Amino acid sequence: MMDTRLSEDDLAFQVEVRQFLTEAWDKELAATYGNIATMKEGAEEWPTRLYHKGWVAPHWPVEYGGTDWSVTQSFIYNSERAAVGAPEVLPFGVTMVASVIIAYGSDEQKEKFLPRILKSEDWWCQGYSEPGAGSDLASLKMRADLEGEEYVLNGSKIWTSYAQYANWIFCLVRTDSSGRKQEGITFLLIDMDSPGITVRAIKTIDG
């Protein structure tokens, strides 16, 4: 019969996690995060507190700042985090683009972006959906044409959460239209301060 009880080391880890979360996810931060007017401040402060503890990116390889937690430790952390109502770190930087950079990025890209993601020095947003391409990303039309050493982009993205805060966007664009529509799609990292980028708000029911 399987023994599902926590080991002494895991119990000690649970105590450490519980104590940290009790102190780090305080009422003031929870209120800041839960208010749409101050959400940006809260969404920056929470991962900063996790960073100083060394827990902002537990799923990363240790060499880049991960924790090497066991499956049980990850379960303990997420269970305790949920119990106090603390959110996951916004996924765009620490989970989505970082995973791609770690797996496929050059050494230069890793050195440039990963430390800044860990320290929450960059806000990332996701540029996938387009006015005519949502769930079917193979239908995307935003073009990126290589001119010299730079790509020139033409097109629009939509439903780009937190674009109003972001200084970087990871974007799917079409670099080749000669094959099937599922081909010729490239993943680009784009500085939101690049010339020609305009961010427009979409009014939603919650303001």
What feature does the model see in each segment?
Residues 141, 149-150, 154-200:
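A short core secondary-structure module
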Residues 10, 21, 54, 61, ...:
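Buried hydrophobic positions in well-ordered alpha/beta secondary-structure cores of metabolic enzymes
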Residues 120-128:
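A short, Trp-centered hydrophobic/proline-enriched beta-strand micro-motif
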Residues 2-4, 99-105, 143:
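Short, well-ordered beta-strand elements within core beta-sheets of diverse protein domains
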Residues 204-207:
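Short, intrinsically disordered, charge-balanced linker/junction segments flanking boundaries
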Residues 89-108, 134:
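N-terminal glycine-rich flavin-associated loop
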Residues 1-92, 108, 112-119:
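Amphipathic, small/basic residue-rich leader segments at the start of a protein or domain
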Residues 132-140:
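Active-site-adjacent elements of ketosynthase-type condensing enzymes
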